[in-house]
Amino acid sequence: MSHFGRSGPPDISDTYSLLVLNITFRTTADDLYPLFAKYGKVVDVFIPRDRRTGDSRGFAFVRYKYKDEAHKAVERLDGRVVDGREITVQFAKYGPNAEKISKGRVVEPPPKSRRSRSRSPRRSRSPRRSRSPPRRRSPRRSRSPRRRSRDDYREKDYRKRSRSRSYDRRERHEEKDRDHRRRTRSRSASPDEKRRVRGRYDNESRSHSRSLSASPARRSPRSSSPQKTSPAREVSPDKRSNERSPSPRRSLSPRSPALQKASPSKEMSPERRSNERSPSPGSPAPLRKVDAASRSQSPYAAE
């Protein structure tokens, strides 16, 4: 509410503003204007009000045209009682340096020195530094390494899979080459191997047949084979015939016992008997002589 009413706000450029604090809710601009006009030309008196209730907020602004007049008003009116309250008058501040007013009084912030001293340990524990770890643990920053780690793991898995696949392909290719080489070797070496196998089989069959042919001769000495017979038996076929067919003298000896006693052929030496039983290839002549003598002594020859 301004003292000049509906005429609108006056031109406050190049003016000096005073702040009046601790006024009552009943005090109006008309009540303050004659009080401050005593010390100079007042340009404007303004009391801020609440927009909801319309009540006074407990302070007012008084503007002077000249600076020296404003200083006089501050010196004379500061601490005066108006409507039962002691008011405070001072130069108003605007912008970042403006005072914070609450219930008609300026809320003075703590001095800067105290702030610096009080906040010095806090600065060591400043919110930036205290909040730095949670910022590092923020979802964006925390997700970025996780995503990178996942990407890294995916790349590592892909590399491992690609390496394993390439290794499997190499192994398969090597196995195919080995199988192909084995097949080519088996095909190229098959006739030689067949010949070797056949030669071994023939040798084994021959040795087996020889062992079978030689085994009965060793087991039964009675069955004489033509290879193991003595050369005397093979060379003298006449002796075989003589042994098989006995002489007429021997055949007649049992019939005529008297002749057997008179014949000197039976009284032969053991050497002749051995010669007769085992004839040698160089003994046909004495056998013939013996036969002639026996024939001359026999009674059939005398007749």
UniProtKB/Swiss-Prot annotation:
InterPro entries: Nucleotide-bd_a/b_plait_sf, RBD_domain_sf, RNA-bind/splicing_reg, RRM_dom, RRM_dom_euk. SMART domains: RRM, RRM_1. Its main location: nucleus. The modification Phosphoserine is found at residues 7, 186, 188, 251, 253, 256, 263, 278, 280, 283, 296, 298. It is found in: Nucleus speckle. One of its GO terms (cellular component) is spliceosomal complex. Residues 294-303 have a biased composition (Polar residues). Component of the spliceosome. Interacts with SNRNP35, CYP59 and RS2Z33. This is Serine/arginine-rich splicing factor SC35. It comes from Arabidopsis thaliana (Mouse-ear cress). The lineage of its organism: Eukaryota, Viridiplantae, Streptophyta, Embryophyta, Tracheophyta.
